[in-house]
């Protein structure tokens, strides 16, 4: 967050597009630490089942950002201008740094030494070779990618098919974000009652149903706004339900590599989502057909990845 603070100040003083892009890149590098370290801290502080519940509620809180950010961002831009936005970023970063210094204790075991670059790479190889880790990481990756497929062309698609304005699409996006929050909240509640594995399967079932409904909606003539929006709401709910549980499971089996596992699983998800977003933009033709096909593919791959993770878990149980 100190890097984010410095980058925010640089962005506020930028005099060219290149400087602004560089500052924004450094902001992303700084703030990305939060998602990785948060998961490692949770893994260090809780046993697997409570950790999944904790991550579910953390994910729900993080899901609030897409709902309130556009509203507050628009108001702040009108009040203080675009440079003022970055001063606000810096102020928030300073507050977070102060809070971290005051209330956050070190959760890493005292007898754990810092890893060298070679040890980090060796740890990454161990994780990639582990069917359980790769299964959970890919489940999260493909579930996340399905959301990025829609995000890439969603505004243009809704404007073309239904004539929605930017403000109206912003409202729709807020509702979808609320659906994601509801899914993440439900993940914590259901995992306590059903267990993590069964809850993930419920989420995958909802994801399959949502994808099938979106495929039908993509070829309906005339296109129906309600069917499209229902399928996307279900998709975001499933995303919120599965993501925290898959992320928690990805760091369970190798607690000594919790930080590496958290960073690697997030990196894989970003790469997969970026690839799907690029493909979506390249094949977009003004219809939802391309999105539907890609969503069906990511849904099938998420099912395969979850089967891979469950198979690895069963093998470990038998050996034990």
PLM region descriptions:
Residues 247-286, 295:
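A late C-terminal transmembrane helix in Major Facilitator Superfamily
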Residues 13-19, 30, 217-218:
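Helix-breaking motifs and short loop linkers at transmembrane-helix boundaries and internal kinks
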Residues 23-64:
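Cytoplasmic helix-loop-helix junction between adjacent transmembrane helices
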Residues 183-197:
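Helix-to-loop junctions at the C-terminal end of transmembrane segments
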Residues 200-244:
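C-terminal transmembrane helical hairpin of 12-TM major facilitator-type secondary transporters
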Residues 19, 48, 56-102:
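Helix-loop-helix hairpin linking two adjacent transmembrane segments in secondary transporters
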Residues 3-10, 18-26, 226-232:
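Paired small-residue
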Residues 106-137:
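Juxtamembrane intracellular "pre-TM" segments in multi-pass secondary transporters
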